[in-house]
């Protein structure tokens, strides 16, 4: 059995990253795939479920896990801590499950150092205007927060060239097709196919 692949997916807020990942998992039942669920010390928001949206833990628990080097990466954001579980991801990959990690460029850098076999994708909006329109359409943030997100988007986008693949989410269906094509191509690489079809290859290569 071949190991799963870790996919690092980054994008500015509003580019459609979460929607594309969710659509991929819902419409691609052929492969075993999961989304990594981060640990966080922030409080649970209405509608969130522990273990689904995040693994909610205390600051003390987070500190202990950090000291045990249980996180592939971790960061502090607005006074709250977030981390990606190393044991969980390694367990899924060893089972042949592809794991998708929704993370910013800084976290992506940390993970690529520790797991160089990971594949990285960056999702771009077609324009600044469209990105701002999407942020406004969500109806979640004030004008001040949207302005800050637009500033953050420029910083995030400036690192797109550090990624293996780039998808422009102008048309959602087309972007989803591109996303699926990347996963399919990675699954067809020689090392993956060799592990999957090892018995067949041995039979084909056996002397008569």
UniProtKB/Swiss-Prot annotation:
Residues 4-184 form the Guanylate kinase-like domain. One of its GO terms (cellular component) is cytosol. It comes from the Bacteria. The keyword Ligase does not apply. It catalyses: GMP + ATP = GDP + ADP. Belongs to the guanylate kinase family. PANTHER family: GUANYLATE KINASE (PTHR23117:SF13), GUANYLATE KINASE-RELATED (PTHR23117). HAMAP family: Guanylate_kinase (MF_00328). Essential for recycling GMP and indirectly, cGMP. This is Guanylate kinase. The lineage of its organism: Bacteria, Pseudomonadati, Pseudomonadota, Gammaproteobacteria, Vibrionales.
